[in-house]
């Protein structure tokens, strides 16, 4: 007989960057593990230093980092942390990205543009990631950018069940804010047993990037409308869509989105909007930090934790969303 046999069991280790430690702690609590102590700081010139306080040799490592602002700093920190795990002889490295940065740059709209979402995936692979676990990617094709397994999680059950439990479903209409979100909105309709409406944007051909008319396809008069989107950044598009629904006789409008990016004028727009409630998950810390009465933040931590457990135990992540 040659070689050495081991009888040790698999070992999971859970790591977090500095971008959103609150979410990391929630996920760790759901898993019943602790976040591995990590020394991380910025040098005077902005370079990032990372060192783990425990050995990761032979462990199945899960590293969570959401790409919130300042996005470039947290992407770079995540890459450095992946590299550190690879050089620490981790058995496997699963990168958890609740919000995947640069996801809107997923194709070339014009010549001489980058496909930055692909670049992020390539950088993670080069750094040493074996698998990516992400929540509600902006487009499905991003799953194909990474040369390895990608587990795509959905916040739809969490968001839809929340809305369905608080409104009269007989008066509910699910609304897609544009043609690109119709497939997701249709799944909401299936889950809630509600009809579908679409806000169609028509642009002024003489003014670049100017939406002049919002046409509503579907009956929204006297209805409680729930606008569904994957992210809200500055809030301009979604608030304009809500205004169009009210103009067409909607009784009330609720806005839901997985990712509350909420940049620039978003706070004022949400505050001054006639929308009664904005519902986000905590993939990003932005929504909770605004502290507006009309903002509700639901925790995505249980969903992420269940997926992590399935990956670690060689189970099925897909089975978590089969009913969807």
Curated annotation (Swiss-Prot):
**GO BP: any one term:** purine nucleotide biosynthetic process
Keyword Cell division assigned to the entry: answer is: no
User: So what does this one do?
Assistant: Involved in the biosynthesis of the central metabolite phospho-alpha-D-ribosyl-1-pyrophosphate (PRPP) via the transfer of pyrophosphoryl group from ATP to 1-hydroxyl of ribose-5-phosphate (Rib-5-P).
**What is any Pfam family matched here?**
Pribosyl_synth
Family assignment from sequence similarity: Belongs to the ribose-phosphate pyrophosphokinase family. Class I subfamily.
Q: Which residues bind Mg(2+) 1?
A: 138
List ligand-binding residues for Mg(2+) 2. 178
- Give the source lineage, highest ranks first: Bacteria, Bacillati, Actinomycetota, Actinomycetes, Kitasatosporales
Q: Which organism is it from?
A: Streptomyces coelicolor (strain ATCC BAA-471 / A3(2) / M145)
| Gene Ontology cellular-component terms listed | cytoplasm; ribose phosphate diphosphokinase complex
Known InterPro entries for this protein? PRib_PP_synth_CS, Pribosyltran_N, PRibTrfase_dom, PRTase-like, Rib-P_diPkinase, Rib-P_diPkinase_bac
Q: How is the cofactor bound?
A: Binds 2 Mg(2+) ions per subunit.
Q: Enumerate the catalysed reactions.
A: D-ribose 5-phosphate + ATP = 5-phospho-alpha-D-ribose 1-diphosphate + AMP + H(+)
Provide the gene name from the record: prs
Write down what this protein is called.
Answer: Ribose-phosphate pyrophosphokinase
Q: Describe which pathway this protein belongs to, using the record's wording.
A: Metabolic intermediate biosynthesis; 5-phospho-alpha-D-ribose 1-diphosphate biosynthesis; 5-phospho-alpha-D-ribose 1-diphosphate from D-ribose 5-phosphate (route I): step 1/1
Q: Which residues form the active site?
A: 201
């Amino acid at each position: 007989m040659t070689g050495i046999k081991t009888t040790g069991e698999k070992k999971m280790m859970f790591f977090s960057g500095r971008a959103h430690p609150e979410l990391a702690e929630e996920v760790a609590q759901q898993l019943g593990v602790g976040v591995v102590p990590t020394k991380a700081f910025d040098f005077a010139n902005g370079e990032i230093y990372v060192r783990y306080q425990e050995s990761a040799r032979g462990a199945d490592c899960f590293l969570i980092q959401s790409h919130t602002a300042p996005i470039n700093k947290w992407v770079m920190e995540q890459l450095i942390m992946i590299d550190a795990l690879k050089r620490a002889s981790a058995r496997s490295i699963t990168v958890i990205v609740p919000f995947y940065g640069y996801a809107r740059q997923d194709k070339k709209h014009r010549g001489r543009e980058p496909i930055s979402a692909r670049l992020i995936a390539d950088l993670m692979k080069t750094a040493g990631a074996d698998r990516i676990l992400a929540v509600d990617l902006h487009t499905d094709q991003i799953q194909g950018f990474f040369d390895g397994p990608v587990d795509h999680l959905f916040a739809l059950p969490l968001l839809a069940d929340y809305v369905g439990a608080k409104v009269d479903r007989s008066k509910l209409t699910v609304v897609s804010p544009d043609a690109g979100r119709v497939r997701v909105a249709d799944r909401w309709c299936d889950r809630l047993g509600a009809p579908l409406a679409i806000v169609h944007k028509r642009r002024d051909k003489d003014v670049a990037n100017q939406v002049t008319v919002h046409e509503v396809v579907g009956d929204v008069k006297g209805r409680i409308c729930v606008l569904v989107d994957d992210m809200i950044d500055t809030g301009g598009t979604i608030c304009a869509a809500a205004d169009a629904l009210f103009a067409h006789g909607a009784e009330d409008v609720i806005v839901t989105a997985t990712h509350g990016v909420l940049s620039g004028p978003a706070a004022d727009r949400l505050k001054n909007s006639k929308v009664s409630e904005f519902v986000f998950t905590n993939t990003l810390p932005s929504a909770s930090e605004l502290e507006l009465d009309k903002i509700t933040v639901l925790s995505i931590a249980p969903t992420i934790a269940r997926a992590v457990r399935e990956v670690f135990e060689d189970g099925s992540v897909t089975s978590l969303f089969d009913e969807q």
